[in-house]
Amino acid sequence: MKTLVSLLLALLLTACMTIAKVEGEQVVNGKMQVQVSAAWNKVNSAWDREPYDMWTQEGVPLDHLRLWAGVPSGETLVTKPTVWFRAPGEKDPRFPTFDAALPADKLVSLFEAIYANEGVVNITRVEPTVFAGAKGVRFEFTLARRADDVILKGVGWVAVHKREMYAATFAAPRMSFYPRLLPMAEAVIRTAKIRG
């Protein structure tokens, strides 16, 4: 029954979205450019304007690449958290807010909060990296999604440049989609450049 409800909800949400193929040079929020060598599908909600771009290969419940660019201090990272299923009495979804004063390792907790709206998150690795030309961190995580009990594996990159946040996350079911699609997501991430 839980799976049926999740499927029906996913179908309803899909009906409220538009999907457009993206290739070549793409600009995220006018602040960061990426080069897309293998086509992705950009997903837009008909009603909500999120502060990130969301792309997918197989459909949002199966995989997604989110890209944030130029998020100013004090802004939330999501306007409407992804919540496929909530149990009675469960806490309200969280809307993490970027603060330019946060150290890099604390920035990871913002993304942990985003994914915790969907299920149980475990951050498995955090390491220094360069993302979009700025010093930051790369992190890995798992997500036990409440809606369908699927275990997702994810990776994220986050950096702060001139008090603005630049980030990306990729997540997919760990058994087949993640190992197959991660190289495509990483190919996009390697090309990320802050504009201006």
Regions found by a protein language model. Name each.
Residues 29-50:
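Proline-anchored loop/turn motifs at beta-strand termini and strand-loop-strand connectors
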Residues 48-153:
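Conserved polar/disulfide-associated segments of primarily extracytoplasmic proteins
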Residues 36, 103-107, 111, 181-188:
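Stable alpha-helical elements in mature extracytoplasmic
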Residues 15-31:
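Bacterial Sec signal peptide processing site at the extreme N-terminus
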Residues 31, 98-105, 175, 179, ...:
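Soluble non-cytosolic domains of exported or imported proteins
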Residues 122, 127-196:
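Short, well-structured beta-strand
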Residues 1-16:
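Sec-dependent bacterial lipoprotein signal peptides
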Residues 41, 112, 116, 120, ...:
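Sec-exported extracytoplasmic/periplasmic mature domains
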